[in-house]
Swiss-Prot record:
Protein family per UniProt: Belongs to the bacterial ribosomal protein bS21 family.
UniProt source species: Blochmanniella pennsylvanica (strain BPEN)
Signal peptide positions on this chain: none
Highest taxon listed in the record's lineage: Bacteria
Protein's recorded name: Small ribosomal subunit protein bS21
Tagged with keyword Disulfide bond: no
Entry's Gene Ontology molecular function annotations: structural constituent of ribosome
InterPro entries per the UniProt record, alphabetical: Ribosomal_bS21 (IPR001911), Ribosomal_bS21_CS (IPR018278), Ribosomal_bS21_sf (IPR038380)
Coiled coil: none
Keywords for this protein: Ribonucleoprotein, Ribosomal protein
Organism ancestry: Bacteria, Pseudomonadati, Pseudomonadota, Gammaproteobacteria, Enterobacterales
GO (cellular component) term, any one: ribonucleoprotein complex
Length: 71
């Protein structure tokens, strides 16, 4: 868990904002959302494979678009 030391003469709002930013950088909230409900291992693998396919298609479409612009 991120630790924030409140500086001298620092307002609560600024300290809270720094804490939220550090939590966001460490990925705690996304991890909590991911673990909120149990996901079967097969479902987890299926979701990961689908996202990998989606990333690959997105990458290919960007490369094709770049090739088209070159000509």
């Amino acid at each position: 868990m991120p630790i924030i030391k409140v500086r001298e003469n620092e307002s609560f709002d600024v300290a809270l904002r720094r804490f939220k930013r550090s939590c966001e950088k460490s990925g705690i909230l996304s991890e909590v959302r991911r673990r909120e409900f149990y996901e079967k291992p097969t479902t987890e693998r299926k979701r990961a494979k689908a996202s990998a396919i989606k990333r690959h298609i997105k990458k290919l479409s960007r490369e094709n678009l770049r090739r088209i612009r070159l000509y």
